[in-house]
């Protein structure tokens, strides 16, 4: 009997050691593949540096930084450094806050947005519903280039726009040396109000509602947009490196720069939001403005993956997340959820965005500065890719040409670590 027990124990030990060895091999194999893809991007000047975080099944399998802040190779990217999230802000700030409003204030998604936001009550947008606008099917314009309205033909700044001197009229910084007139936000709102509406019922991406959501948050909750997010999500989840206007909180050497802007700001955009409209909103906006490192974002995505729960606390109801992250109009050619992006509907798997490996239940969002966050609940996986592909200019297109984000997501999903 003792011999049998001894032999069983030895087999169990060998099996466990074999499993641990197999696990280590898979992790090293995943890291090697990710390294190869990211380094190829750096070598082809898709971006000077990046962060990648991959969570699979039960733990973080990779959390790594690559390259430098810029191509001069002076400041190496580290895991605590912050990237400009661009439109990823739409799901990790404005949609996140709106989901909480939906729960706490019983918002009816089929009611008109104008019932909640009086700004558009007597406009061509008065009949648009939250369901339509959040899924980009209301015919609203994609974007307004506000930055093209602040300078005269001779290049000088117009009155009540920007100033190189901060005072009681020009209060909020756009950059270290440009300050925004306190009434400029009203101009942005008026322009949104007056934009045309085209082809209601057809899918057309629009970011305009996300400029309006922060005011809705304040109207219903009594808290500013950033305070609401901090108090309901970021602070109780222990997220310390996720913020608007990072220059107020962190040293510049911990913030990755974006673009050498020769047209609008006429300086390197560093520590301030890259998106021009969000910048003119004072850096706090629902369309863009968040900065973070990958580790901070992982907590939010883990909460999404765990049906609204994080470390034993329920932040959102499972049914809320399921509603917002599912296709809103599944019988149409619109792939979108409510605020969230979804896989494209291409019939050829190799052409499917963002990856041929991700399931139809997956969701996430990309960002213009070179980011992607994606959650796949079926594979119990999420991936975070942060980069500054717009350095030195937004004309850098190698990130798209090399299909880097899709390749990374392919590898993240393929790395089956359940054994």
Label for each model-derived stretch:
Residues 1-25:
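Bacterial Sec-dependent N-terminal signal peptides
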Residues 17-38, 154-172:
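Sec-dependent signal peptide cleavage junction
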Residues 25-85, 106-108, 190, 268, ...:
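Short, conserved catalytic-motif segment at the N-terminal edge
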Residues 35-38, 52, 58, 84-110, ...:
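Active-site SXXK
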Residues 51-53, 63, 84, 132-135, ...:
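Structural recognition of the beta-strand scaffold that forms the well-ordered cores
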Residues 108-123, 236-237:
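Short, glycine/proline-biased beta-turn/loop segments that scaffold the active-site neighborhood
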Residues 125-361:
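Short, surface-exposed loop or secondary-structure junction motifs
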Residues 365-419:
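Structured C-terminal helix/loop/strand segments within mature extracytoplasmic catalytic/sensor domains
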